[in-house]
């Protein structure tokens, strides 16, 4: 074995198999680039990002761990989201949800909070 050497199995690696996914269109309405990381609760990303946040509740980008997607000012992109797994709780980022993303009451409360915090939402 050589230090740092990789032993790669044959075949494809599949991630997020049998998990709910959705595609949404997102536009950066701000004047600065915005980068969103792989495990960020997409519902709570930057308030200048305009998209249907209801569709993104309890979901993150369906990209490899440790990577990100960058949105330039005025840029519109379609991204694929995947549902959280495990306990499916979201905390922090913009302090909108801070709890269980499987409960409809939490979703409705969070959508109402978006309005008071001036988040873009289609």
Swiss-Prot record:
A cellular component term, taken from the record's GO annotations: urease complex
Keyword Iron: no
Metabolic or biological pathway, per its Swiss-Prot or TrEMBL entry: Nitrogen metabolism; urea degradation; CO(2) and NH(3) from urea (urease route): step 1/1
Keywords attached to this entry: Cytoplasm, Hydrolase
GO MF annotation, one: urease activity
GO biological process terms held by the UniProt record: urea catabolic process
Localization (cell): Cytoplasm
Main location class: cytoplasm
Catalytic activity as recorded in UniProt: urea + 2 H2O + H(+) = hydrogencarbonate + 2 NH4(+)
Signal sequence annotation: none
Pfam families according to UniProt: Urease_beta
Class of this enzyme: hydrolase
Record flagged with keyword Nucleotide-binding: no
EC numbers: 3.5.1.5
Family according to the record: Belongs to the urease beta subunit family.
Assembly, per entry: Heterotrimer of UreA (gamma), UreB (beta) and UreC (alpha) subunits. Three heterotrimers associate to form the active enzyme.
Protein name: Urease subunit beta
């Amino acid at each position: 074995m050589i230090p740092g050497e990789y032993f790669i199995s044959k075949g494809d690696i599949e991630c997020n198999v049998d998990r709910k996914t959705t595609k949404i269109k997102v536009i950066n309405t701000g004047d600065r680039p915005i980068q969103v990381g792989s495990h960020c609760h997409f519902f709570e990303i930057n308030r200048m990002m305009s998209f249907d946040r209801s569709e993104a509740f309890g979901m993150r980008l369906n990209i490899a761990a440790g990577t990100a997607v960058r949105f330039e000012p005025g840029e519109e992109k379609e991204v694929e989201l995947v549902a959280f797994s495990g306990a499916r709780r979201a905390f922090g980022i913009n302090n909108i949800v801070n709890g269980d993303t499987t409960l409809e009451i939490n979703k409705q409360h969070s959508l109402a909070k978006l309005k008071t915090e001036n988040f873009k939402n289609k």
